[in-house]
């Protein structure tokens, strides 16, 4: 496996240690010994208990809830490794928070995604490995190389096995216009039809009207998005597909299960039969909703890490 004489070291913060353990098991190395904790006043503290001098270091930490704590853990881990003379540091961020704040929606708004993208570089990271950024152009916010893995192939494999030949009679539905490109690629891979839920207000102070563009009548549908946060949009879209479009059944999938606030209650009470999520965010976030099924991205991240370590192209992981 070693092609350049450097040791590979993998460490994790507290955001998603289960995923880090699974990745290490697949690669065949032990998770690095480190302690990531907080002082009484809330400051993050990192202690590395093994040498990283000259090593190729991978630091795994999603910037998920508690978002700011997870982010600071990652940044301080990067700094600790660079100050300990690590040869190269890759920040592995399966879920990159703040990505939705990627533009100025109104006057005097910050572009927080750009600010946060600067932080790993300022801390000393040499590369970022992430998955399904909310907008792919966020890769350009970083001043270091970024590998943005796609969850699409994982879902394609899952639904191809789940539904088999039935896929050709199903429809992929984008819950909004902004997700159409992502949903179209997914639909093409599975030879499914494509539909869009269009939300609009006809006049001021009127309720939002949900229109379904495309034929979903009598069809089994899959709602496809990059994340589920409070689940309001995806549950409303599912309701429109059934009540307005006349769909037979609705499944949903998303790369990142943020699942904030009323999300679990909304999913439990929705018409959605199953919600497939990737484990970029801890599976414990989905406890309380039996509809949720987690699919592991550890194999994809493990292969990406090995390829980066060996200086091999990761292009095959996008197919």
Predicted segments with their positions:
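PRPP-associated nucleotide enzymes
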Residues: 1-319
